[in-house]
Amino acid sequence: AHEAAMHRLGGHVTGFSDAKMTRAGDWYQESIKDTVKMLEFYGDAIVMRHFQKGAPHEAAMWASVPVINGGDGWGEHPTQILTDLYTVLQQKHRIDGLRWVAVGDMRMRTMHSLGYALTQFDCPVTFVSPGPDDLFPGSPDMRMPEEYKADFQRYSLDFKEAEHVEQVIADADVILVEPVIQPDYT
């Protein structure tokens, strides 16, 4: 999607689909800093999709060109949420004041980015996800991780949590659904 967007804007793309095809791969283990210092000579921006949470943030600290986070492991996926916000804006003609319900696995990076994005608007959001199940020992806790909830509170996001969509769906203006699965971000 990032490549297609650049071509639609009249730009060109130089890239690689796998870090193993670069000096950051298995043999050399080049650092993010060294990789970015090399990449910044190839273009005017870097779109980084990385398996490591926080890698684009680290890359931005070293780069002399803008770094766009195209998804980072279990961390964030802001470009996806920007696309979702744009779709809502096209369909609803506004974002402020809409009541959001986010359903699924809150460990997913898009849910984290949704929370951060909604801090910029007057939008209450309810995160709906299952907690650990006593009937199935070892089942994952899919609720929003504490580190993100702390950030959302610090940024004054109006949010709450629920375990069942039936509790909140009647009040929703926008529903964002993520699968309840174990993604492989490697």
Descriptions of predicted regions:
Residues 2-89:
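Phosphate/diphosphate ligand-binding glycine-rich loop within oxidoreductases
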Residues 179-186:
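Glycine/threonine-rich flexible loop motifs
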Residues 56, 112, 185:
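Active-site-proximal flexible loops/turns
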